[in-house]
Structure formats: C-alpha cells, structure tokens
Amino acid sequence: MCPDTLFVCSPHGENSGDGLFGRIADDLQDKGYSINPAVLPASLSDALLAHMLQMQDEQFNPAGIGREPRHMHNRFVRNDEICWITGESTAGRNWLRWAAELQTFLNRRLLLGLFSFESHFARYAPGAYYKRHLDAFRGDTNRVLSIVAYLNTDWAAADGGELVLYSDMTDRDGLRVSP
C-alpha cells in the first residue's frame, strides 16, 4: 500500500528544478503518486551508490516496523537491512539537500506542511523482501510523502525488487515500478 502520495525516481537523470518538481507536484495532485525514471542528477545517484557500496556491513541493521516504543523486527513482513542517511558524508548531505529543495517546493505549491524528512539506504540480499504494507505508522498521519530512489545498476527483471503501488486494500494487481 502507498501513503496518500508517493514519489518514485530512478538514477542518472537531469538536474532537478521547477520543471521536474512541477511535474512531481502535478502528478501528486492528479494521481497521488509520481513516477519519474532517470531524474536524479547522475553525480548525486553515483555518489550515493558509491558511498553505500563502501559502507561496512556493521553499518547496516535489520529493518524493523513501527515506531518506538512499538518498534520491532518482524522477518515475516520485511527482512532487508537499512542504514540511515545522516548527512555525515558528502553524498548524504547532497541527497538531503536535494530532498529539502523538493520538500520546500511541494510545501509552497501544494501546501503540504511537510516539516521533517528522514532517509535511509535499504539493502536487499537475494530473496529479501518487504511485504505489502501501508507506508505509515499505525495511528499516525505524519507520513505524507514517501520517496523511493533506486540506485541499482544493471537491474534485470529476474532480480526482483519491484515496488508495487496499490490503489486500495481490494487492489490485487497494483502498479509495478521497476528499478
């Protein structure tokens, strides 16, 4: 399941700006999601991927579900590993800056009232998954927008890992978004 709005992008695209951000805003307003392949600046996506690949395994932790104090690890729901992007690296700072520019634009254009942003790398070993879910914490309405940026290179359909957006709880097929 997706939250009220979702933005999906893939690496190696044009620089961001009002054109891209305007398209995203229009899509969010019209459809509730925006899928934009190849829109992150290549320098940004390449730097993020390089940074992630040089990270030590210990920097990644099993992903959980829920927010404290209900946060838990549930390997039946998801078994990927995550590492928070804090801005300690140049790549992380640049990503957070890009996302902040998008946030500011969407706040002005759509009056969303977005006031915070958090981000992490998610690493999926072969066979790993994150099952169908609503991308929001139970009982909370604070997650308004989710961004998924694929950093994969040389992805093939056999690799799996598509994001599936469902329109509602009765939607069985969903809209598949490939990395």
Language-model features: locations:
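Fe(II)/2-oxoglutarate oxygenase catalytic core
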Residues: 1-146, 150-179
